[in-house]
Structures are given as C-alpha cells and as structure tokens.
C-alpha cells in the first residue's frame, strides 16, 4: 500500500510539474475555406501530445491584408503571436523578424521537403520558415456537364474554354438562371496577380519581371493574354467575377452554378464532401494555354514560421515541426486535399486514393511559375499591387490591355528606381 501511495505521489507530482511547464501558444493560421478547421485539428493534436495549449487567432481572409497586419505586429516586435502561417512570397519581406529553425528541426527532416521551397524560405543563410503545403493553380470542371454537352476532355486552350463555357452556360440557364460558364479570382488583390501571371505566361508572355530584374510585362503576348481574358467577362464569366476571391469563386462552383473554375487544390476536398451538390462530378486538369503557349500554374503555398520575439520559442518551433511533418501533411492531404511539400507523399497510396490528381498533375505542381518575389525583394508588394491594379482596370474595362501594360511598365520602372 505504501509502495502504491509512493508511486501515486510521484505520478501526481510529475503531472503537476508537467502542468507547471505547459505553455499557451498563439497561432495565426488560416481563414480560407476549411483551412481554419484543419489548423485547429493539427494544433489540437500537438497540444494533446505535449500537454500545451494552442490558441488560434482569426486573421484577414485576403493575403494582402494579412501581410499588412503581420508587418505591423512584427515591426513593433510584438510577442502576441508565436507562430505565423506565411505566404511563399513573404520570406524576403518579413524574414528578419522570424526565428532560424535550422537549430530546432533536424536536417534530415528539412531535406525531405522540396528543395526549391526550402531555398525560398532561407533568408540570409537562415531557415526562417518550414514548408507546410504547396499550391499551384488548376482548372476544375464538371465531368457530368462535359459529357452532357458532348465533350470528351477538358479545354486545352483558352479559346476552347470560352467556347465550351458559353455552350454549357446557355444550356444550363434554361433551368438555372444563376448558372455561369467560368469563375476565377478577379478581385483586385494578390489572387489576381496569381491568375494574371498564369494567363500571361500561358500565352508565352513571360513574367512581370524576369529573373535578371528586367521589367518584361509590356509585350505583345501579354497584351494578347489580357485581351482574351477580358473577352471572357460578360460572355463566359459573370461581370461579378471582378469581386471574387478564392472563396467567392468556390461558393459559386460548389453550389453547382458553374461549369469551370480556376482555384487552388484545397477546393477539391470541399467539393467532394458529403452533401455537396457536385460531389463525384469534379474533374481537375491543367489550366488552358494560349496559342502556341504552354499551360502555366502560379506557384502558391504557405509556410510556418516562429516569431523571433516569441516568449516560448522552443515550444513554438516544436509545434511547427509537428505540423510540417510527414504524418500531419499526410492527414491534411487525405482529409482536405492540401498539397504536401514532402515528395514521398505524392507516391503514398492513401494520398493518391483520396486525391487522384496529385499523381496526374505532379508535373504541374513541381514546375509552377514563381511570382517575382525573389528578384524584387522588399519591393515585391508594390510590384504586385501595381500589376493587379493594372489587370483589374482591364477586367473592369476601364482600360485597354495595351495602354494598361504600357502605364504599368512606367510604374514598375519608378518602383525599381536604381535597382530592386
């Protein structure tokens, strides 16, 4: 009895000691689609495993607003948030305020991730963020409607998309006045930068700024690309698409009110959920190409980083290690169709069963087109704002593509000044 009491006493003492050392971390995570719920599942699993607590904070939906908030917090050296979810184009903008994770996460685990993303997240020789999920724009289509209207495959070119979208739209509107052919991200924000870069690149018009730092956006093929997309609005795409972000587009699509959608892979799992009117009717393909061009998908994706001013850096780094590890990335891939950043998971049977297009579109994900964040450095945000605003003026028909890109070229030259 005395022995049992002694053991019980030690157990209680150990539990009390563990509780005394437990910390509460604050995690600025996702607000898009099922993103917040998936963040909570992962954070709760780590909390249960370690005895710590994770408090999730709601953040702005649009990445531009999120970045502005984070820059304000980090610029003030605030310790309110321990772990940040950051966009793939932010390391150069806020890296100086983030902790070097190379001393907290074993090198072998870091090497399991796509090298290009690890390199992207390395600033001044410091690993300031761990890859969490990668992204590339894809084309969603309704398999049942393509069959209904006599199509055997999704569109390979933007002209084909326009023709197919208009035909299906005309037919479906006889019974559903809300039906539209195509939805995408047409609102003036970072999402439009992603979509427009795909359009221009797929027409052979290059990027906004090339890797050498030269401003290249004002060229005939870029003009042609914007003319083509401008022509979709009011014909194959609704005028309201210029107010759509990712979720607005997904809501139209998931309600069964569009034939095609450009979005990120996360929308697949949401559409396949039980009760969804389009479950079992979703196809995913590479985005269309322009004449003589190749399909292009903008590289997206998010990372996890630790605030350099966190009061609990050890625990925060451990949370990042857990969430970006193979086990959690596999769970997120299977349950929510988030693209892993660990190459071996693209050969995992469970992952491929849940998200078949991870296998068929693997090359799309590994050859995605990067935004010019590295070459433009701290000026990237200004570059992106100017670019999306110019494109938005074209989509809303306030400017013609040629003059809009010529004006943009001048704006970018002023932003560049003597150099990036």
From Swiss-Prot:
InterPro entries: Bact_solute-bd_prot1 (IPR050490), SBP (IPR006059). Gene3D superfamilies: Periplasmic binding protein-like II (3.40.190.10). Residues 1-24 form the signal peptide. Keywords: Signal, Transport. Probably part of a binding-protein-dependent transport system. Belongs to the bacterial solute-binding protein 1 family. PANTHER family: ABC TRANSPORTER PERIPLASMIC-BINDING PROTEIN YCJN-RELATED (PTHR43649:SF34), ARABINOSE-BINDING PROTEIN-RELATED (PTHR43649). This is Probable ABC transporter-binding protein DR_1438.
